[in-house]
Amino acid sequence: FHTLGESDCPFCGQCITHCPVGALQEHDDTGKVWDALADPNRITVVQIAPAVRAAWAEYYHLDPKFATAKRMVTALKEIGFDYVFDTNFTADLTIMEEGTEFLQRFTHRDQYKWPMFTSCCPGWVRFVKGQFPEYTTNLSTAKSPQAMFGAVAKSYFAEKLGVDPHNIYVVSIMPCTAK
């Protein structure tokens, strides 16, 4: 018997949505988030994926005119988050990193395997590593937008705020269990 972590499961979440008996569920860290929000020594930062912004209105049966990004930000601030960010910010950073890497690989084609694959989806990266390990070196070395956000929040943002990175608690609201 192996755990999912020991398998080559890409953590895409399809088994959770399709299990006929509901035996599987996503990992729930809601309690940890509430604890961080209640801790006066923690700076809580949340990032929201674009798909979540689009889906929340549908889930709650809200009129699209009412379900604005501004209202979502307000709601997250009301429950206690100190800072709210859009993951699109670091998606742009990922694109710049992958673009730079592509140009490096392109100008030194003989040193790299082709084609270069994106690394922006953790499920995709895990799938390639598990099912097609011979293509692992084709993957970009750039972090996913979600992972890049965590790194930026704990380094650059912490420095800008003048706080210890350990006091920053980052929450990711993502549409996918692989993230």
Segment roles from a protein language model:
Residues 3, 18, 133-136:
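A generic, residue-level signal for flexible/boundary positions that often mark functional hotspots
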Residues 25-179:
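Iron-sulfur-associated redox domains of electron-transfer enzymes in respiratory
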Residues 7-17, 115, 171:
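Cys/His-enriched microdomains
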Residues 1, 10-32:
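Iron-sulfur cluster-binding cysteine motifs and their immediate structural context
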Residues 1-14, 42-50:
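Short Fe-S-cluster ligation motifs
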